[in-house]
Amino acid sequence: MAQKKTVYGNESISALKGAERVRKRPGVIFGSDGLEGCEHSVFEIMSNAIDEAREGHGRVITVTRYNDRSIQVEDMGRGCPVDYNPKEKRFNWELVYCELYAGGKYNNLDGDNYEYSLGLNGLGACATQYSSRYMDVTVWRDGNKYSLHFERGEPVGKKGDELRIEPTDRGRKTGTRTRWLPDLDVFTDIDIPADYYVETRASRSASKTKSSPATLRRRTSSTKTASSTMSPRSRVKTP
């Protein structure tokens, strides 16, 4: 056991930086470092997809719950902007996934991008990325397919080459797909029950979007799936 220090001086003060701001104190963002906090992190990614649907972009949201406890959320929205932002002089993927308090939902009252939105605007995607063991993001927009890979809050790839860009493989279709594994080094429990995806506030919000039903798929090791429309009364079917 380390000996307790008795000196409390100027060098005793330190600041958490980058991913450590969430990884060491997840409760500050998500309200808990337990299962509820982990569920909140999932809610943040789901709510981004639902915000797109409620604005009329995309008709289906698919949430897949894998046996290894990773989660995938895929929408048919406009696709998260991830390319270079001349105004901020940074890539948007850095702002969205690696910078707290950055996003496109701060001017809602002006009708800028969203009339209304769920979640921790400007915090959710980044905080969930920071708290994950890994995260894979794929975006289809502007005629391109953009791919990103993160591990424990950090982008993977050579500096300047983290964002992979290739011609789209979906024609004119756009959208965002996010798959990640909540990190047990951050949360004490990541075994989210299937009913959460049906009964969560995000699911209820999706059910109110009549033109955009959200579909839950529970994937098994044999790759079979069970689907149900996300509404307050729906339940996940057992494969």
How would you label these PLM feature ranges?
Residues 2-12, 69-92, 103-223, 230:
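GHKL-type ATPase core
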Residues 26, 30, 49-53, 100-108:
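Structural motif corresponding to the C-terminal cap of alpha-helices
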Residues 47-77, 81-85:
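ATP-lid-like helix-loop hinge signature
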